[in-house]
């Protein structure tokens, strides 16, 4: 594909408007921003848009819990999101909201076209209904016992213990996660998008090169299982757009969310007098790219292109999918302080450090990326401070002091300069293909060559010898020329460092002008371009993150407590189980155990892994109380009560050799049973 005169529209996935941006979000936005900045440097017409995903039940409920309107909540969150992105130098041309008139108009238009073309069906379905809140419950707002493995406190769509999927109506003893009430089953008419009608088109499009091979292979699993009609409606009360021609039906958030890409661009078109249809018409020859995470790839690879096709719009040119971010080899953890919010990072560290580190580890595959904090410090200090910036500083002083800031009028080593310029197209190809890690390795290899050149020439030795002034100027100028080329190559990754370098060089860095050296050119006095990272900064950030997450958890619990009724109703309690005999009870062997070690099970949202001392032996027990204990290590040393003669059970995440007793309704409302001081591990509960 030609690199000239391309017309490109780029989007990032829309962050949900009910919580802060964290470093996991930033991977995608940094990846997209680097690609966009590179395209701008190449002279292409490119538009970069995003928006907040601002509809849905979670937003409605959170606003109610906070005592504000959903509109107030999403406005506050959007302001914070945009500030975080600006802090990381994400160069959006427009940042909008799905709760906008542009999105309402486009959602209604696409729905009407799909309906006219026969792709909208309706039928009556059975749903769980909260009688206290008078609302139908989405899958994730119902909890109960898994119908397959009987694990308690599972969501309404899948079990996190045995991985089974099911309907909310199949849950045993279901309860509303909103009010705690027992839901009832009610019927309601819903509207469905006829996804199976697009199977042939989707199969062809999925294998057309529009998706990474790993994504296309994953989508094949959906085709093998058979595509199903997609429920695009929700019942009132719901925060979103009402479906035209209905009284109490709303578009499901995942219908209007991707349309938010179009809405944000349409808002930009109004502001800058751009042609919206040129980018979205079915016969458009412009390019459209979505950067997204692997958790939402099926929406973008199946539902979204089918919606566009059915509504007579163009499909994406390509969807670029990335993996998750881990920290120090583990899932981001609030208790360990590695669930780091973007705003917390910005209070302690330069955003360009993270931009560089992510770029150095990014490829065009969907592998997860590990933010190893020790490696992070070492790589930034070695590559950016010791090698790159030092290349400029070790030469600039001589140019400023001995030659009044004037560079030599010719290159000292034309072949070396030519070698650096010759790598331009290879580095450009890496950027184009999102192989940022390969681009960084190539650039740093050139940086090593530049520093070796200076080391071999030893300008500090030349400076001490009379009659070698011209040679000194030529050598130091050559070092500056090479630094300029390197900074040009790194400009998409490090825009602020590039900006400071441009001020020092007194010249703009563009991809095309790098081949023309700055001969007989004046540069500004050198000032520090980049600061070294200190481990103490990392430690301070982690501690701040721990404190902030703890404060948020405390606030959430307080809000939830205040939102509940002040007096308990009899219906709040589970009924007493059928009577058993004393002989039945005698079969249960309850023992006191001491917690030796307690840690999260990273792959599970519910489980903690305990290593217990029963006095006579040690055992491993998996317990679904993660929601109640954010700092599992704090449980170490505590005594708990265990069902000791329960048969070992093989679970998805390991073998559990017993059951720890706790009381409560589930989730965060769980409390471990305690024992008086003096009891020993292994003591039997009588």
Curated annotation (Swiss-Prot):
Pfam families: Anticodon_3, tRNA-synt_1g, tRNA_bind. Keywords: Aminoacyl-tRNA synthetase, ATP-binding, Cytoplasm, Ligase, Metal-binding, Nucleotide-binding, Protein biosynthesis, RNA-binding, tRNA-binding, Zinc. Residues 584-686 form the tRNA-binding domain. It comes from the Bacteria. Transmembrane segments: none annotated. ATP binds at residue 334. A motif ('HIGH' region) lies at residues 15-25. Its EC number is 6.1.1.10. Its main location: cytoplasm. It catalyses: tRNA(Met) + L-methionine + ATP = L-methionyl-tRNA(Met) + AMP + diphosphate. InterPro entries: aa-tRNA-synth_I_CS (IPR001412), Anticodon_Met (IPR041872), Met-tRNA-synth_bsu_C (IPR004495), Met-tRNA_ligase_1 (IPR023458), Met-tRNA_synth (IPR014758), Methionyl/Leucyl_tRNA_Synth (IPR015413), MetRS_core (IPR033911), MetRS_Zn (IPR029038). A motif ('KMSKS' region) lies at residues 331-335. Its cofactor is Zn(2+). One of its GO terms (biological process) is methionyl-tRNA aminoacylation. GO terms for molecular function: ATP binding; metal ion binding; methionine-tRNA ligase activity; tRNA binding. It is found in: Cytoplasm. Belongs to the class-I aminoacyl-tRNA synthetase family. MetG type 1 subfamily. Homodimer. This is Methionine--tRNA ligase.
């Amino acid at each position: 594909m030609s690199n000239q005169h391309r017309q490109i529209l780029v989007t990032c996935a829309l962050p949900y408007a009910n919580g802060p941006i964290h470093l996991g979000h930033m991977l995608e936005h940094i990846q997209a921003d680097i690609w966009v900045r590179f395209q701008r440097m190449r002279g292409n017409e490119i538009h970069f848009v995003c928006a907040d995903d601002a509809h849905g039940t979670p937003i409605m409920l959170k606003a109610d819990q906070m005592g504000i309107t959903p509109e107030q909540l999403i406005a506050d969150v959007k302001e914070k999101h945009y500030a975080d992105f600006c802090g990381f130098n994400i160069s959006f041309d427009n940042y909008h909201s799905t709760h906008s008139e542009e999105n309402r108009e486009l959602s209604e238009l696409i729905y009407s076209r799909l309906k006219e073309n026969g792709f909208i069906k309706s039928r009556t379905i059975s749903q769980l209904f909260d009688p206290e809140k008078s609302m139908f419950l989405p899958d994730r707002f119902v909890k109960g016992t898994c119908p397959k493995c009987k694990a308690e406190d599972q969501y309404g769509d899948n079990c996190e213990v045995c991985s089974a999927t099911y309907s909310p109506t199949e849950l045993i003893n279901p309860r509303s996660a909103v009010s705690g009430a027992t839901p009832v089953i009610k019927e309601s008419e819903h509207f469905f998008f006829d996804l199976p009608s697009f199977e042939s088109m989707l199969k062809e499009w999925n294998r057309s090169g529009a998706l990474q091979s790993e994504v296309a292979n994953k989508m094949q699993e959906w085709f093998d299982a058979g595509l199903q009609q997609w429920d695009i409606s929700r019942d009132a009360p719901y925060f979103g757009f009402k479906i035209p021609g209905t009284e109490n039906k709303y578009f499901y958030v995942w219908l209007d969310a991707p349309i938010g890409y179009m809405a944000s661009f349409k808002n930009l078109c109004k502001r800058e007098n751009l042609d919206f249809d040129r980018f979205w018409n079915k016969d458009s020859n412009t390019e459209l790219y979505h950067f997204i995470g692997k958790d939402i790839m099926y929406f973008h690879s199946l539902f979204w292109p089918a919606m566009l096709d059915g509504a007579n719009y163009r499909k994406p040119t390509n969807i670029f999918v990335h993996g998750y971010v881990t920290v120090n080899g583990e899932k981001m953890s609030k208790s360990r302080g590695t669930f780091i919010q973007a705003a917390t990072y910005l209070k302690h560290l330069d955003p360009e450090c993270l931009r560089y580190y992510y770029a150095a580890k990014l490829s065009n595959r969907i592998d997860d990326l590990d933010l190893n904090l020790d490696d992070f410090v070492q790589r930034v200090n070695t590559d950016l401070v010791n090698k790159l910036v030092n290349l400029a500083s070790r030469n600039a002083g001589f140019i400023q002091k001995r030659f009044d800031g004037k560079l030599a009028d010719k290159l000292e080593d034309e072949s070396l300069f030519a070698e650096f310029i010759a790598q331009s197209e290879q580095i450009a190809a890496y950027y184009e293909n999102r192989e940022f890690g390969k681009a960084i390795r190539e650039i740093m290899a050139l940086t090593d060559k530049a520093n070796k050149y200076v080391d071999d020439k030893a300008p500090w030795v030349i400076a001490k010898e009379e009659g070698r002034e011209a040679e000194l100027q030529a050598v130091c100028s050559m070092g500056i020329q090479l630094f300029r080329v390197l900074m040009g190559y790194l400009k998409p990754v490090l825009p602020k460092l590039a900006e400071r370098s441009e001020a020092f060089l007194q010249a703009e860095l563009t991809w095309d002008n790098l081949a023309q050296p700055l001969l007989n050119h004046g540069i500004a006095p050198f000032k520090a371009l980049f600061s070294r990272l200190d481990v103490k900064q990392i430690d301070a950030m982690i501690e701040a993150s721990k404190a902030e997450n703890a404060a948020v958890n405390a606030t959430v619990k307080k809000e939830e407590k205040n939102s509940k009724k002040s007096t308990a109703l009899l219906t709040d309690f589970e009924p007493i189980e059928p009577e058993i005999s004393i002989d039945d009870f005698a079969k249960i062997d309850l023992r006191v155990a001491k917690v030796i070690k307690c840690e999260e099970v990273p792959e599970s949202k519910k489980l903690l892994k305990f290593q217990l001392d029963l006095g006579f032996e040690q055992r491993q027990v998996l317990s679904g109380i993660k929601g109640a204990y954010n700092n599992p290590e704090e449980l170490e040393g505590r005594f708990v009560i265990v069902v000791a003669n329960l048969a070992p059970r093989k679970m998805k995440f390991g073998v559990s050799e017993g059951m720890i007793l706790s009381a409560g309704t589930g989730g965060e409302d769980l409390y471990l049973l305690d024992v008086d001081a003096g009891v020993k591990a292994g003591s039997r509960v009588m």
